[in-house]
C-alpha cells in the first residue's frame, strides 16, 4: 500500500476515534481495561470508516475508488492506530487480540459492487 494512501486511511480511522471517549479510555489505570476501551473505540471507528471486505480481502475508499488492501497492511493499521492513540508501551503486546476483534468487524462489512457502474481513469459511466 502506498505511503500517502496509508497515512490518509490511518488519519481517517483515527479521526473517527479521537475525542473525549479516547481521552477517558487512556486514563484507565489497568492495562486490560485500557486496551479493551480503545479496542471498542477502534471497532466503532472501523464500522464508520470506508474499510470493508470483498471476496475475503479488505478494501478501503481512496477518494476515487475502493482499493485492495493486504491483511498485513490492515494489521499494521491497527498497530499504528494504537501508537497514534499514545497507548503505554506494555499495551502493544495485546495487539494480536485487538487485531482479531477488528478483523471480525471488517468481515461484517461486505462491499456490494454495482455492476451498472463502470469506472475509467478519467470518468465514471453509469449504465442506468
Show where each model-derived region lies.
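Intein modules and their embedded homing endonuclease domains
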Residues: 2-128
Amino acid at each position: 500500500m502506498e505511503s500517502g494512501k496509508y497515512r490518509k486511511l490511518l488519519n481517517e480511522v483515527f479521526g473517527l476515534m479521537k475525542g473525549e471517549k479516547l481521552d477517558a479510555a487512556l486514563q484507565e489505570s489497568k492495562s486490560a481495561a485500557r486496551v479493551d476501551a480503545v479496542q471498542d473505540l477502534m471497532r466503532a471507528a472501523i464500522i464508520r470508516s470506508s474499510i470493508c471486505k470483498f471476496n475475503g480481502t479488505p478494501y478501503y475508499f481512496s477518494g476515487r475508488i475502493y482499493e485492495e488492501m493486504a491483511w498485513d497492511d490492515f494489521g499494521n493499521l491497527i498497530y499504528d492506530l494504537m501508537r497514534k492513540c499514545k497507548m503505554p508501551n506494555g499495551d502493544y503486546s495485546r495487539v494480536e487480540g485487538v487485531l482479531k476483534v477488528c478483523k471480525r468487524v471488517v468481515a461484517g462489512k461486505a462491499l456490494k459492487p454495482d455492476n451498472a457502474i463502470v469506472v475509467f481513469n478519467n470518468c465514471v459511466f453509469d449504465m442506468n
